[in-house]
């Protein structure tokens, strides 16, 4: 509908315009005539499809035929032609976007893979793969020297003037001038730097090729003329700057595109975009073509120059000299290159030889031989012009297929001729390109043999000929190989030959091993791969050589000392020997350079370790007997006399550390000052050291152990009398007796070595000699106390059991002879048990200390209700009786076999006065008075005491604690005095030492609860206590001196039970408070989790 309406509108407009023209040009505006003109206009429209020639003839008719026709002609000239409407194709006929993208991608890949090139230039994709071969896409340094005095850098280096001065840059080439790096000549003013900038964007469609020549000339001028250093910079220094440097290398260093880019890639990671690489490929093609043209022109000019030089030589020298031409051969690779002058002269000599008819054996001179200097110049000029014309036709000769066939045929004829006579070969046209030379070759090729006199003059063979010959040989070999492969059967024979060829390639070139294994990865068995590996590394040759040497059984000649590889120390040692006049011993040098295998080295190292451990154990035994200081007290022979040569003495520090670690130091470390001189015992013979193959000492460990056991056995028998005398000494005096007169030997006498401990054991109880409980601490500690490791019970057992037992073989207690067999697990168990025991004791003492502190506090005395006098008297009497009962009934410590069984040793419980008990008796408990705080310091925070960690407060053994501590009245008074005097000094203690807790007040000896009333009462008394604290302490001192021992003891016992019950109740209340608080925390957590879950559900 729309199109029809438009047509109607156009027709109406056209009719109006026709009427206007008619009224303007025609003289008869009558209505009838106008109607008639309308009819004729429609007729003319109907016949307007007539061809151009016919329409022209119609319109060229005279005007009198019809005025309407004339009007139509005028209208067609005045009005523009109607434009033809082109119907737009529907959307369904258009290509979809996906298809267009695929086609675009395909075209891009085609451009990247385009390898069309006359000079085998690689495609863009291959170049990009070569540049990104090692997966390093970004440079590691902001600036790198990619070519001598040529640096590629990023923007940060280009704008750093100080760094440019340090680098010594004299020229700057900015590849991003105005497009990222905004520098210029004004920026580098005053630095004596020449600047050049090009404005190129780093886009694939950017054209950087117009700047290749100018930038390369700038670089060449900077390097050659100014002898300077050039910085080529861009934004990142990977694309634009790298392309410009590559263009310089291609233009002025005659490199190909791959050589230039890889040369830069060696020093810096570069990544030019695709468009720049395409432009570099085009530059590479252009340069290759120019070089070929230059080579052709150079060859043509050289040929002309050589010809003129030859004619001048003929003018000055007789033409006979042409037969004796001096040929300069330069060996380069495998072919010889002959100079063009000699080749031209050889061509003239050949032409002369052909004309003279050299087939005759007498070699007569021809008539038309080149004339002497008297010859006319016209012939010579004509020859030169003819040679020039022939040289200029060589390109047509290259393009001729007949010429290539002639070359191949000539090669075949060369192969068929006799090897003694050298055949004619096509010479290189770069050196000899004249028509005469070709004619000579053709004529000589038709003859059966050449003349011997001309063999030297035609012996030139160029590099191209050698290349052709090599290529033909390769083609023949390939053809022969294909022929053999076709004839051969596809059976095991073919596979075996293939393997043989591969093995041959492996033997010739080890680098082909990877390709061979890659091709035959699935076909080879592990044994075959192992054999090939042996071939690759040359093990088979070594074995064959060794077998050959063994079969010949001839003494090998001594190698040259210069070929011997020595270490730096060995070389220095030889130089020192020569310097001081020593002679060079060849056998010693070879022995030093001969590397020993790992097994021998391990055996030698093991022997050295065994020897060292043996020496240390012997030194321990020696230190037990004390040969250094008390050799006069005993007449036995020292151990060092047995093995003076084999076992050198070790240091005292080594003895001490070794014996402490091994845990086998003898319990006989204490030496008695009252020992009697025993009878001389028969000394066991020491083990004889066995010499190894290299002169080293071979040690038999079993013999050494037995020998040590026998020596120790005899020594212990000698010392038994001394120990019997030491057993009668009181336990409290044993340490001083055994360590009397020993100030220097404390380290030797305090070490643990159970090597000789088993000698004093009875057969029924062979595991109890040394105490480990509380006394082991004095031996292991570094306090330097010279306490004895023997208890009274242990000494008596030793004296009783030594008469019955005798060591015959090496005993096997917990720790064996050497250090590496120590059972560390048992040592850790023993240490943990000792620590736990000490922890329990300290916890009980802490509770006791707190009770003692609280019963003397002022606050407790004020809160304590007054009792009746009768009750006080009863309590005093009861307390006195209990105190006397406790002092009289001091139970002896029980023997604890739990810890002693770990070391198979007796417990040290027989000594009633242990060092721990003595130390704990004098422990001064710190004051439990709370820290005085100011009013504005906030609420008082008390820390939880350490005894809150106890899970079972009712399980505390307070009765055993009271029974184990024996405190007399005097000691109690002294203790209370010391404690009261410490109260004053404890006022300024650190608040961290006070017991602070948010939920529980300090323990004050009462039956406390966690109620608010107790806290309020505590705070009320605190202010009063602050004001009169010092007075209370002074009064307490005087009251302690006035009270009798009975009153103090009875009152303490009575109050102690109440305090313990209050303490237990307090612990239970705190535990319940903690549990309640944890429950509240759990409820808060659960509520929070439910809220979070509801929020997450709402979000979902």
Curated annotation (Swiss-Prot):
Description of the deletion phenotype: At 2 dpf, morphants are morphologically normal but show pericardial edema and tail curvature. They exhibit near complete paralysis at embryonic and larval stages, producing extremely low levels of spontaneous coiling movements and a greatly diminished touch response. They show a severe disorganization of the contractile apparatus in muscle fibers. Sarcomeric structures in mutants are almost entirely absent and only rare triads are observed.
Keyword Amino-acid biosynthesis (UniProt): no
UniProt keywords, alphabetically: Cytoplasm
Gene Ontology MF terms in the entry: MAP kinase phosphatase activity; protein tyrosine/serine/threonine phosphatase activity
GO cellular component: cytoplasm; sarcomere
Amino acid composition bias (Polar residues), ranges on this chain: 1-12, 356-374, 907-916, 994-1013, 1029-1041
Xref: InterPro entries: Atypical_DUSP_subfamA (IPR020405), Dual-sp_phosphatase_cat-dom (IPR000340), Prot-tyrosine_phosphatase-like (IPR029021), Tyr_Pase_dom (IPR000387), TYR_PHOSPHATASE_DUAL_dom (IPR020422)
The Tyrosine-protein phosphatase domain, residue ranges: 141-289
UniProt tissue specificity: Expressed in muscle fibers in a regular striated pattern (at protein level).
Region described as Disordered: 1-21, 356-383, 411-436, 479-504, 542-561, 575-615, 667-686, 888-1060, 1075-1100
Function: Required for myofiber maturation.
Name listed for the protein in its UniProt record: Serine/threonine/tyrosine-interacting-like protein 2
Gene: styxl2
